[in-house]
UniProtKB/Swiss-Prot annotation:
The chain crosses the membrane at residues 89-109, 124-144, 147-167, 179-199, 206-226, 276-296, 311-331, 357-377, 385-405, 416-436, 448-468. MFS-type transporter; part of the gene cluster that mediates the biosynthesis of heptelidic acid (HA), a sesquiterpene lactone that acts as an inhibitor of glyceraldehyde-3-phosphatedehydrogenase (GAPDH) and a growth inhibitor of the salt-tolerant lactic acid bacteria in soy sauce brewing. Might be required for efficient secretion of heptelidic acid. Belongs to the major facilitator superfamily. Residues 7-17 have a biased composition (Basic and acidic residues). Residues 1-31 are annotated as: Disordered. One of its GO terms (molecular function) is transmembrane transporter activity. Keywords: Cell membrane, Membrane, Transmembrane, Transmembrane helix, Transport. The keyword Transport applies. This is MFS-type transporter hepF. Gene3D superfamilies: MFS general substrate transporter like domains.
Amino acid sequence: METPAGKADRPRDHDSEQSQDNVVSWEGEDDPTNPLNWSPLAKWVHVAIISIGTFTIAREKSPLASSIFAPGVVELAHEFHEENQLLTTIVVSIFVLGLAFGPLLAAPISEMYGRWICYTVFNILYTIFTVACGVSTNISMLIVFRFFAGVTGSAPLTIGGGTVADLFPMHQRGLALSFVTLGQAVAPAIGPVAGGFLTQNLGWRWVFWLLTIVNGTITICQILFTRETYAMTILNRRAKRLRKTTVHSSVTHRSVNFAIFFYSLVRPCKLLLLSPISLIVALCCAVIYGILYVLVTTFSPVFQDTYHFSIGISGLGYLGLGIGNLVGLWIFSMTSDRYMVAQANRFGSAKPEHRLPMMILSGPVIAAGLFWYGWSVQARIHWMMPIVGSGIVGLGNMFFFMPMVSYLVDSFPTYAASAIAANAVLRSIGGAVLPLAGQRMYDTLGFGWGNSILAFMALVFNPLLIAIYRYGEYIRTRWQVKL
C-alpha cells in the first residue's frame, strides 16, 4: 500500500511493513544497520557510484550509452552497406526500447533479492552485451545486442531512486537525487563529443570498447565498495540468521518462492494500470522523452548536413542540451529540499506534491527551446543559435524530470523502484517510437514547423501537470494501490 507522505522521512519507514509480515525489525530508531542511519560518507559513496553508473549505462534523456553512438551511425551504415534510414535510426532507438523492458525485471528483482545483487548481475550482463555490440558483423546482429544492452543497462536508472529512498529521509532526497541524476545530465554533452571523435579517428566499434572499459571499472567499484541498502532484504537476512542461532520459532523471514516473485514482477504493471497518478505522470513523461529523442537522433544529421560539421565536430552540437541539463539540475538541487522544509514548517508536514511547482514550468520552457531550435535551423542562422535553443530544451527537461522522479520516490518510498519502473515502460516506448517518425516529419514539414509541432505537444500536456500539483494528494489517497 502507498506509504503516507507524512511518514516517509522516518527511519522506521520499512519497519512497520516488516512487522506486519512478522519479520524482525530495527533495534531502535538509531540502529546503525538501518541504511537511513549510515554515516554521510557511506551514503554518498553509494550515490557517487550510482551516478557514474547512470552516466555510462542508460536511460533518462539521452544518456551516454545511447547518445555516444549517435554520431557513429553514418559510418556504421556505410560499413554495413545499409541505405535504409529507418533501420539506422532503430540502431539508436532500440536501446531505449530495451530500457522499457529492463525495469520490469530490475525493479522486482531489487525488491525481492536486494539492490546489491541486482546492480551486480545487471552491470555484468550489460558489459557482456556491450562487447557483443562491438564485435557485431551486421546491422541485425547489432540491433539485437543493442536491445539486450538496453534491458540489462536499466538497473542503475531504475533502482537508483529506490536506493536514494533507502538512504535518505524525504527532506534530504532532492539533493541526493540530483547527484544520482548528474551523470545523466552531463552525458548528452560528453557522450556525443567523445563518440564523434572516437568514430572519426578509431571507428564506431571503439565507442563500445570505451563503454566496456568504463562500465567494467564501475562494476568492480560497485561490487567492492557498496553494500545492501534495501531495508526488507537486510531485515530478512537478519531474521534468517536469528532462526539459525535462536530457538524462537516466531522469528521468520520472507522466503522467496515463485508466487511471491511473480507478484513482484507484476507490481510495476499494477502501479501503471491502477494508480491514476502513476499513469498520468508516465504518459506525460513518454511525450517529453520522445521529443528529446527526436532531437538526439537528428542532431548529427542537422549539424553535418546543414552546418557542414565533420563527424567529430558534430558531437559538439549536443553541448547545448547537456549544459541546459546541468543548469536545470543545479536549480533543482538548490531549491527543492529547501522548499520542502519550508512547506513542512508552514503546514506541519511535507507532501510529495511539494516537489512539483518546478515541473509546471517545464512545458513552456521546453516549447520555447523547440521553437528557438527549429526556426534557427530552418533559417540556417549561425550554428550557435540552435545550440542555445537545445540548451533551453535541456533546462526544461530537468525542470520536468527531477520533480517527477522525486515525486514518485516520495509517493512510493518502499516500492520506489517499482514506481520508477512503471514510469520507465511508457517513457522508454515513447523514446523509442517517436524518433522513428522524426526524420520523415522534418523532411515533410521542415525543421521550423516540425519542431513547432513538438513544442505544441509539450504545451498540450502542461494542464495535466497543473492538475497533478493541485489534486495529486486527493488522487493518491482516493485510488490507493495494494502493493
